[in-house]
Amino acid sequence: QVLVMKDGKALYDRCFGYHTDANSEKVKPTDIYDLASLSKTTGTLLAIMKLYDKGRFNLTDKVSDYLPFLRKTNKENLTIRELLLHQSGLPSGLLFYQEAIDGKSYKGSLFKQSKDALHTVRLGVRTWGNPRFRFNKGMTSKEKNGDYTLQVCDSLWLNRSFREEIRKKIAEAPLKDKSYRYSDVGFILLQMLAEELSGKPMDEYLWQEFYQPMGLEHTAYLPLRYFDKKEVVPSAVDRFLRKTTLQGFVHD
């Protein structure tokens, strides 16, 4: 899709190609794409700004005042301002999914800097993964039922207890100095903060406060809750963790 606008008017608006190949959906103007890290500003930040405007918190407040699992940890004194500025000392990211993988289910290491017979999936510039692993017993299900309520892709659901694993991993993560360091972890905490203060899941709060009132008819968190799957363009083929094409679910 190519759109060129000037002074509020569309000068050029054309669609080309297909979602995956010539046998799939043609690209349409209303198709929905994964915004990836842009969701920090088009989602999480919007929610935080709205709650700030409503007087629900001050920027100098400690995050632990609202998220008790951070109390009595090295993150007890982190402020909301530091999270927003990426100056909290938090790591850039954490591999939460490792907590769901059975460490005894695969040979060798899970990651390696170069490709070999075991590490066949490229995950980064110098990172290759071993996809021959199993998840911990009781952690995943192929369908939603009972305690398995956290959907990761079409046929993978996590036990809701995994939220506690995420909180634990964040609480135990080391802190570095407070120079600028882009951090996904900081914005995960901001999402938790927004949901705690609003009393609503992030997708519902954003839909009600922003996307619906603004007439953004094809924008949403968790798009498959609001749109038909065929309206969403596939974003990645995950050969490592979920072993499927991702459509309507985040790729990282």
What are these regions (language model features)?
Residues 20, 31, 62-69, 99-101, ...:
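Short linear capping/connector segments at secondary-structure termini
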Residues 8, 32-60, 187-195:
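Active-site SXXK
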Residues 26-27, 73-77:
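Extracellular/periplasmic catalytic domains that process cell-envelope and extracellular macromolecules
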Residues 59-73, 213-214:
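Short, glycine/proline-biased beta-turn/loop segments that scaffold the active-site neighborhood
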